[in-house]
Curated annotation (Swiss-Prot):
Its main location: cytoplasm. Specifically methylates the adenine in position 37 of tRNA(1)(Val) (anticodon cmo5UAC). It comes from Cronobacter sakazakii (strain ATCC BAA-894) (Enterobacter sakazakii). Its EC number is 2.1.1.223. This is tRNA1(Val) (adenine(37)-N6)-methyltransferase. SUPFAM superfamilies: S-adenosyl-L-methionine-dependent methyltransferases (SSF53335). PROSITE patterns: N6_MTASE. One of its GO terms (biological process) is tRNA processing. It catalyses: adenosine(37) in tRNA1(Val) + S-adenosyl-L-methionine = N(6)-methyladenosine(37) in tRNA1(Val) + S-adenosyl-L-homocysteine + H(+). Belongs to the methyltransferase superfamily. tRNA (adenine-N(6)-)-methyltransferase family. Pfam families: MTS. It is found in: Cytoplasm. InterPro entries: DNA_methylase_N6_adenine_CS (IPR002052), rRNA_Ade_Mease_Trfase_CS (IPR020596), SAM-dependent_MTases_sf (IPR029063), Small_mtfrase_dom (IPR007848), tRNA_Adenine-N(6)_MTase (IPR050210), tRNA_adenine-N6_MeTrfase (IPR022882). The lineage of its organism: Bacteria, Pseudomonadati, Pseudomonadota, Gammaproteobacteria, Enterobacterales. Keywords: Cytoplasm, Methyltransferase, S-adenosyl-L-methionine, Transferase, tRNA processing.
Length: 245
């Protein structure tokens, strides 16, 4: 007799190896974070930092992708989100090598003496606009509490010379962010432009910067093909995570 299927929990997102509750987080699990967590280069990373960790999604994805010797830090300003990230991480297979810090990244950066081979962030990207329903969501969406210049400066203090700082942004914000990064001494090394459907213009961009100069590798990613199914490239990128892929 076949066993009944385990019902999916409804207060978050179930992945193949972990669950992310996000009901106490301003920004929910979404494609942007999943793209960045699956895309960021982890090959040489021994220490990983997630700035603005929210529910802990990126931290958990990168923990799954890295060896057991790799340690990860997740920094989140909002206390409720940081607590939920701790709960998600404690319930995961990688709790022993992850630390969550409820802190302002500028203050936290000044207290650090070690550097990271990989830093990731799914940062706020809207200028101040229409008021959000809650202060926490406004903090997560708008650059008023963490502008891009400050984010880049903090990452510069924490990155190793050969390390990578990776972000996901709207396509419309990518060029301005890259210019600002260049002004602060960063070098763009990886860029992937992401389109939702065949025939559509890119709507997101994945960027990896390094303090060290070098060739920039650029490519494109299509999320869905003409049949509206996930494209082979998107499946290859994310199949280790999506439950039904």
């Amino acid at each position: 007799m076949s066993q009944p299927k385990t019902p999916l929990r409804r207060n978050g997102f179930t992945f193949k190896q972990f669950f992310v509750a996000h009901d106490r987080c301003a920004m929910k699990v979404g494609t942007d974070g999943i793209l960045l967590g699956a895309w960021a280069p982890v090959a040489k990373a021994q220490r990983v930092l997630d700035i603005g960790a929210g529910s802990g999604l990126l931290t958990l994805m990168l923990a799954q992708r890295t060896e057991d010797t790799v340690t990860l830090d997740a920094v989140e300003l909002d206390a409720q989100a940081a607590e939920q990230a701790r709960e998600n991480i404690d319930a995961s297979p990688w709790a022993a090598r992850i630390q969550v810090h409820s802190a302002d990244i500028q203050t936290w950066t000044q207290q650090q003496t070690q550097r990271y081979e990989l830093i990731v962030s799914n940062p706020p990207y809207y200028d101040k606009g229409v008021a959000c329903a809650t202060p926490a969501r406004e903090q997560a969406r708008y650059t008023t509490t963490l502008d891009h210049g400050t984010l880049l400066a903090c990452a510069a203090q924490l990155i190793t010379e050969e390390g990578f700082f990776c972000v996901v942004l709207p396509e419309s914000s990518g060029e301005a962010f890259s210019r600002l990064a260049g002004e602060q001494g960063w070098h763009l090394r990886l860029r992937t432009d992401v389109a939702e459907n065949a025939g559509k213009l890119p709507h997101r961009v994945l960027l990896a910067f390094s303090p060290s100069p070098g060739e920039c590798f650029c490519d494109d990613l299509l999320i869905r093909g003409p049949d509206q199914h996930y494209s082979p490239a998107y499946c290859a990128l994310t199949e280790a995570f999506y439950l039904f892929m």
